[in-house]
Amino acid sequence: MLNRVVVQGRTTHHPELTYTKKGTAILRFSIAVNGINSTSFFDCFMKGKDAESHELMGKGTEVFIVGQLMQRRYKRKNGENSFKTEVFAEECNYITFSDYDGTGQNTARNEVIHSG
């Protein structure tokens, strides 16, 4: 079965880096993707060295993500089991937009500054 996600959006908050009991880094963040009529929000995560290398990603950073959908089970505070669908980001590219080039001209420069 095919499970592939490609999405581009802006981070909605600073990412949260945690470690599992075995020492694996997990980076969690959310992105907002503007659609034609509405904005969609996706919770994302990365694992391992990629997670550690993206820890400095800030709120509002535009990212291009390639990955897959994953579902995890967790317990709510009231004890009920619940499920959450997230994007496991296998690749995360930062994209920057510069709207001022120092000459008084607005530009729409687009460059990849990190690929993980």
What function would you assign to each model-found segment?
Residues 1-3, 15-23, 52-55, 79, ...:
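Acidic, gly/ser/pro-rich intrinsically disordered tails
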Residues 3, 23-25, 38, 61, ...:
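Residue-level preference for beta-strand/loop junctions
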Residues 4-6, 25-33, 39-43:
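A short glycine-rich, His/Asp/Glu-containing loop-to-beta-strand
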Residues 5-13, 31, 59-71, 89-92:
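OB-fold and OB-like beta-barrel modules that bind single-stranded nucleic acids
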Residues 17-33, 83-85:
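Short aromatic-glycine-enriched beta-strand elements
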Residues 35-58:
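A beta-strand/beta-hairpin structural motif
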Residues 51-52, 70-72:
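Histidine-centered metal-chelating micro-motifs
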Residues 70, 76-97:
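OB-fold/S1-family single-stranded nucleic acid-binding modules
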